[in-house]
C-alpha cells in the first residue's frame, strides 16, 4: 500500500468517526426533542435529524476533498523530488564518462552542430578538459568529421559538451550538456514521471 492510500484511509477513518459522533449527538438531541414534543408532533425532530445528516455528509465531503488535495500535493512533491534526483544523476554520469565514451559523445555533438551550421570552418568552445581532449585527438576528430577546419576557442563554464560556432561568430549551436538538458527537460520530466509513477 503506498503512502497516498494510507493517508486517504486515515482521513476516511477520521471522517467516519466524526460523522458517527455528529450523528450520535443528533440522535440524542432528536430523542430528547421527541419526548418533549410528542404532543406537538415529531416533525421538528425529523427536521433536526435530516439537518444533522446533511451536515454530516457535507463535512464528510469536505474532509475527503481536503484529503485528496493533500495527497495530490504530496504526490507532486514526491514526483518532483524523484525527477530532480534522476536529472542530477544523469548530469553526474555525463560528467564522469570515460575518455573514449566522452570523445564519442563530443564527436556526435560536433557532427550535429556541423549539420545544422552547414559550414566547413568552425570554432569550438567547452570546458578546459574537453578542449584539451579535442586538441590531443584533433587528427582523429578531423578524420571523423571530414574536410572541416576546427579552431579551439576559449574555455567556458560547462560540465561537458561543446558550443560550436562559425569562424565569424555569427551562428552558433549550443550543444553543452546543460543546454541539451534544458531543451529536453520537459520531455525528460515526462518520461521520468511515466517510469517512476506509471
UniProtKB/Swiss-Prot annotation:
It is a peripheral membrane protein. One of its GO terms (molecular function) is proton-transporting ATP synthase activity, rotational mechanism. The keyword Membrane applies. It comes from the Archaea. Its main location: membrane. Keywords: ATP synthesis, Cell membrane, Hydrogen ion transport, Ion transport, Membrane, Transport. GO terms for biological process: proton motive force-driven plasma membrane ATP synthesis. Has multiple subunits with at least A(3), B(3), C, D, E, F, H, I and proteolipid K(x). Belongs to the V-ATPase E subunit family. Component of the A-type ATP synthase that produces ATP from ADP in the presence of a proton gradient across the membrane. This is A-type ATP synthase subunit E. The gene is atpE.
Amino acid at each position: 500500500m503506498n503512502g497516498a492510500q494510507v493517508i486517504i484511509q486515515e482521513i476516511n477513518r477520521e471522517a467516519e468517526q466524526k460523522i458517527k459522533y455528529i450523528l450520535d449527538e443528533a440522535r440524542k438531541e432528536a430523542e430528547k426533542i421527541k419526548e418533549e414534543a410528542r404532543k406537538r408532533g415529531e416533525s421538528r425532530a425529523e427536521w433536526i435529524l435530516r439537518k444533522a445528516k446533511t451536515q454530516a455528509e457535507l463535512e464528510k465531503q469536505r474532509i475527503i476533498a481536503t484529503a485528496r488535495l493533500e495527497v495530490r500535493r504530496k504526490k507532486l512533491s514526491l514526483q518532483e523530488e524523484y525527477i530532480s534526483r534522476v536529472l542530477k544523476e544523469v548530469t553526474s554520469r555525463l560528467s564522469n564518462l570515460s575518455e573514449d565514451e566522452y570523445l564519442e559523445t563530443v564527436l556526435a555533438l560536433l557532427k550535429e552542430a556541423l549539420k545544422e551550421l552547414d559550414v566547413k570552418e568552425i570554432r569550438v568552445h567547452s570546458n578546459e578538459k574537453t578542449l584539451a581532449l579535442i586538441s590531443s585527438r584533433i587528427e582523429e576528430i578531423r578524420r571523423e568529421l571530414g574536410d572541416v577546419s576546427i579552431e579551439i576557442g576559449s574555455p567556458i563554464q560547462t560540465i561537458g559538451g561543446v558550443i560550436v560556432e562559425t569562424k565569424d561568430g555569427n551562428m552558433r549551436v549550443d550543444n553543452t550538456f546543460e543546454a541539451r538538458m534544458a531543451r529536453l527537460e520537459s520531455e525528460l520530466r515526462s518520461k521520468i514521471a511515466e517510469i517512476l509513477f506509471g
